[in-house]
UniProtKB/Swiss-Prot annotation:
Protein name stated in the entry: Nuclear transcription factor Y subunit beta
Start-end of DNA-binding region: 59-65
The keyword Transcription belongs to this UniProt entry's keyword annotation: yes
GO biological process: regulation of transcription by RNA polymerase II
Amino acid sequence: MTMDGDSSTTDASQLGISADYIGGSHYVIQPHDDTEDSMNDHEDTNGSKESFREQDIYLPIANVARIMKNAIPQTGKIAKDAKECVQECVSEFISFITSEASERCHQEKRKTINGEDILFAMSTLGFDSYVEPLKLYLQKFREAMKGEKGIGGAVTATDGLSEELTDEAFTNQLPAGLITADGQQQNVMVYTTSYQQISGVQQIQFS
């Protein structure tokens, strides 16, 4: 990515998000809040759009490196530039999926991007092989959150996610694993930042 002068910031357009998606006519997920003001264009004293700081648009490189190390032998090593490359790719991927999900919300005149929108976007953009395992994880997560609310009645920060994932979104019985073309069952692995263990889904925890 290119830098503007000596600034360490990166413009949102470099993430593959067009100006239309930053404006109020579309809906985007903001890193800090979802108020109406944060969804509009911001102007600084020079009249230019507010830039995102790199630490706001990138996942911690330590987490990225940890995921990468899971895919290589224990004796393998990963160069710094490879980690940074994947770190940027992750942000590009998030922007790519979210923009498609945002378009669906705009067409349906909704302002909240939910789990079903993300799954729809992934399927539309050609990531069909990921949709079924993610449906499984989201249903398990929703059931676990309902169980917690039934026991303690506590309201958590993830309540919005569990409420958005309605029963209509998961009407079909989900498999415990994927069935490959040769009839063999394939285990499902889901990467998550969730602190809790959900039965039936193998998890890799991030710090």
